[in-house]
Regions:
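Active-site-adjacent structural elements in enzyme catalytic cores
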Residues: 1-148
Length: 148
């Protein structure tokens, strides 16, 4: 999925097999994955979110914020830590993607991880993504807008 600064690999969080497949394909055995939640309310299902953390999450920059999991054992396939990186949608395509799953009781968030392999430059161009991520990504969501 093409974002503002490069490509992400995305997958449902509620299926540990998806996380394991991403780990295997990216050669990323232990590093935690970040997740994208629809909004701060959705993040509260899984995490403790203080007013200050919500302000930062919902701000214009939409950074990844480390939030404390409500249950430290939850989402072990994403992060073995008591915290997990959470971000909110920051492009219209992300918003549409999250809205597509609105009302799906099994859906809470998406894994969002950089599409580049460890120690390789960020992939910014569509052609480079399609050729460089063959065998890693199952599909591609491309757009013509340049990344920054």
């Amino acid at each position: 999925m093409k974002g503002l600064g490069g490509f992400h690999l995305a997958g449902r969080c509620d299926d540990p097999e998806i996380a394991l497949t991403l780990r295997r394909r990216k050669h990323r055995d232990e590093k935690p994955f970040a997740v994208m939640c629809r909004d701060a309310e959705a993040a509260r299902i899984f995490c403790e979110v203080s007013p200050e953390e919500e302000r930062i999450l919902s701000g214009a920059r939409k950074p990844i914020v480390l939030l404390r999991k409500k249950d430290p054992r939850s989402w072990q396939h994403l992060s073995e830590n008591s915290q997990i990186g959470v971000m909110l949608p920051y492009t219209p395509v992300h918003v549409l993607l999250m809205e597509e799953h609105d009302g799906d009781p099994g859906f809470g968030a998406l894994i969002m991880t950089s599409a580049n392999l460890s120690d390789t430059p960020i992939i910014r161009e569509n052609g480079s993504a399609v050729s460089g991520l063959r065998g890693i990504a199952d599909g591609f969501l491309l757009r013509t807008r340049s990344t920054s």
